[in-house]
Regions:
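N-terminal "arm"/small-domain region of PLP-dependent enzymes with the aminotransferase-like
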Residues: 1-66, 472-474
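A short linear hydrophobic-aromatic micro-motif
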Residues: 83-85, 236, 358-362
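Conserved C-terminal alpha-helix-loop-beta "cap" of PLP-dependent enzymes
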Residues: 319-483, 488, 492-502
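Conserved PLP-enzyme active-site core in the AAT-like
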Residues: 10-18, 22, 42, 81, ...
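Conserved N-terminal alpha-helix of the aminotransferase class I/II PLP-enzyme fold
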Residues: 47-90, 114
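Charge-dense polyanion-binding interfaces
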Residues: 502-513
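Short glycine-rich or small-residue beta-strand-to-loop segments that form or flank ligand, phosphate
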Residues: 58, 85-87, 177-180, 337, ...
Length: 513
């Protein structure tokens, strides 16, 4: 691989690929787009021009020794990791590799119930047994997470730390503790007491930090990173919040974990080769290199401060029916969560209304809009968002209602009931679970939802889930393969889908089968 000295270059991988693209070389190798030359302009002049394959003049993204390795080392230095690995196949693959690095097949793990569906898939592939930490719904307005009188910034349940500590103490055979933080609403639920208790028992702590890739850029503004809290391995989705191509992601291993487990670095590289494509994308890898360099720049810090100013501006400009929910000390201040509970809009009405006005948002639940501003989002976009919400408010038949009646309506209405049901499902007691067998049976299942509801059955009759039930976004499983679900809950899911919640189809099997 390339042994040219890129060690002093701020973006070694990006620069090496750019040098190759500018060299005028003749390509008789894959990919068939000839380094992007086969594409029409402007596509050919963009990142597609960095398309390449593993050559002597660049590097191997799965086993780097040249510019790609230098780029990973620069990422590790910036993020505070002992080792960082680039993934061009997304955080799902990085999560598979993280678990395979830390755990033997068949291991028992304790995990937050608010994990991404990728963990359920990884548990099936690695035959892991999952033990779920007890969850609870925080009191409204507690810990800066909500505004008076009631709405929480994040409706997701949080870990019940006292009960979780007891579970760690009494559960035998645990091999790891797994968190997901921050969540889709930007809230970090990573109790330090649990992390320390896990380390005291010799357990590695793993974290899906997909939404926290920007935190290292301004430690005085953002919550502490997972690595800074003492997490041993974590995955970040660079493409979610940074200027990187989708699905660019990173896997970090901490210094302390590598001291305790020197073989982990080798295992991580081997796990990446096991799960990632053998043709990783050079443009995506280069964008990871660029994103890290951008986070290190003075320009990035200036953009972050500007973004905070833009959010303050938006808070002042929104119509009365909408409110930017304040960020507490454990919330991402750049994650824009807007309450719409007193607006009178349904989820579908608000999503389609904004779309019709040219505003595309990340997610809407039954009471909130969730927006992910890019680090360089201009003030004009916030002005346009405010104008769109004002226009919708004026056009809506419920315009002019006072705030209190709106809140009361929300408290008594279907949106509040929907939120309560989702919280109840995530907080329910759950048995130890090995989802592998049910997951692979589900590939052949002929019973699906909602089709199964056309059959006769009692409301309390149970069926076994054989594929993940996870509204998307945010992709948090309500049921995992191997768990039982009643027809009553299946019907309730159908109601929620009719109200605007996107629930991908899933498979089931009858308990008699």
């Amino acid at each position: 691989m390339n042994h040219e000295d890129f060690s002093t270059v701020s973006t070694p991988l990006f620069s090496a690929l750019q040098k190759e693209a500018d060299s005028g070389r003749t390509s008789f190798h894959m990919p068939g787009n000839r380094g992007g030359k086969a594409f029409p302009s402007p596509f050919s002049s963009g990142f597609a021009g960095l398309e390449s394959t593993e050559l002597e003049i660049n590097d191997d993204l799965n086993e780097p020794t040249g510019p790609a390795l230098l780029a990973e080392e620069k990422a590790a230095a910036f993020f505070g990791a002992g080792k960082s690995l680039f993934f061009t196949s997304g955080s799902t693959v990085a999560i598979y590799a993280m678990l395979a690095t830390a755990l033997q097949p068949g291991s028992r793990v304790a995990a937050s119930a608010a994990l991404h569906r990728a963990f359920a898939q990884a548990a099936a592939l690695l035959d892991l047994e999952m033990v779920f930490l007890p969850m609870t719904v925080p009191k409204r307005g507690a810990d800066g997470r909500g505004d008076s009188p009631s709405l929480l910034r994040s409706p997701l349940p949080v870990i019940d730390t006292p009960r979780a500590l007891k579970l760690l103490e009494k559960t035998e055979g645990l091999r790891a503790l797994i968190f997901s933080a921050p969540d889709y609403y930007g809230h970090v639920d990573l109790p330090q007491e649990l992390l320390e208790a896990a380390h005291a028992r010799g357990l590695p702590v793993l974290c899906d930090e997909a939404h926290g890739a920007a935190f290292a850029a301004a430690v005085e503004i953002f919550p502490k990173t997972a690595l800074a809290r003492g997490v041993d391995l974590c995955v970040q989705s660079a493409h979610k919040t940074l200027p990187a191509l989708a699905p660019a992601s990173l896997l970090h291993l901490s210094h302390s974990y590598l001291r305790r487990c020197p073989e982990a670095a080798r295992r991580a590289v081997a796990a990446r080769k096991l799960f990632q494509t053998s043709s990783p994308s050079f443009p995506i890898g280069a964008s990871l290199d660029f994103a890290r360099a951008y986070l290190e720049s003075a320009e990035c810090r200036e953009k972050i401060q500007l973004l905070l100013d833009h959010i303050t501006f938006l808070r002042q400009e929104l119509p009365p029916a909408f409110q930017v929910l304040p960020a507490g000390p454990e919330d991402d201040p750049l994650r824009l969560v807007i309450s719409c509970r007193s607006s009178g809009f349904s989820l579908r009405e608000l999503s389609s209304g904004l779309s019709s006005l040219g505003i595309d948002i990340e997610m809407a639940d039954f009471s909130r809009l969730v927006l992910i501003p890019s680090l360089d989002q201009p003030r004009e976009d916030f002005m346009r968002l405010s104008a769109a919400l004002r226009k919708l408010s004026l056009e809506h038949k419920g315009v002019g209602r006072a705030e209190k009646p709106g809140v009361a309506c929300w408290e008594e209405g279907s949106a509040a009931r929907a939120e309560e049901d989702l919280q109840r499902w995530l907080c329910r007691p759950r048995a130890f679970l090995k989802p592998r067998a049910a997951t692979f049976r589900g590939l052949f299942s002929k019973v699906d939802w909602p089709g199964v509801l056309s059959e006769q059955g009692e409301g309390d009759e149970s069926l076994r889930v054989t594929s993940v039930i996870a509204p998307y976004p945010p992709g948090i499983p309500l049921w995992l393969p191997g768990e039982e679900i009643t027809r009553r809950d299946l019907l309730r899911l159908l109601d929620l889908q009719a109200e605007g919640l996107h629930i991908p189809p899933f498979t089931l099997e009858k308990l008699s089968e």
